[in-house]
């Protein structure tokens, strides 16, 4: 009886280790993203690629068209 419990516990532990690696690799925590309205982008923001290009000239990593008024918001890691 004791041997079967030990065998079951060993099998269960190996199965849990195998299943935990199937869930994907551990990833590091992502940095928070801060946003600021672009100072150089003028007019209605229609194309996000245009907004991102302007934001990169301002030193940000990218940009998105946001809000009801379609303004260009630049993004960077905090």
From Swiss-Prot:
SUPFAM superfamilies: Scorpion toxin-like. PROSITE patterns: GAMMA_THIONIN. Disulfide bonds join 34-78, 45-65, 51-72, 55-74. Predominantly expressed in the pistil during all stages of flower development. It is found in: Secreted. Keywords: Antimicrobial, Disulfide bond, Fungicide, Plant defense, Secreted, Signal. One of its GO terms (biological process) is defense response to fungus. InterPro entries: Defensin_plant, Scorpion_toxin-like, Scorpion_toxin-like_sf. May be involved in the defense of the pistil against pathogen infection. PANTHER family: DEFENSIN-LIKE PROTEIN, DEFENSIN-LIKE PROTEIN 1. This is Defensin-like protein. The lineage of its organism: Eukaryota, Viridiplantae, Streptophyta, Embryophyta, Tracheophyta.
């Amino acid at each position: 009886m004791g041997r079967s419990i030990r065998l079951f516990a060993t099998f269960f532990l190996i199965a849990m280790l195998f299943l935990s690696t199937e869930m994907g690799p551990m990833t590091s925590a992502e940095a928070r993203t801060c946003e600021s309205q672009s100072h150089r982008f003028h007019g209605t923001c229609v194309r996000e690629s245009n907004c991102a290009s302007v934001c990169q000239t301002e030193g940000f990593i990218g940009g998105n068209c946001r809000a009801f008024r379609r303004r260009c918001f630049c993004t960077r890691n905090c």
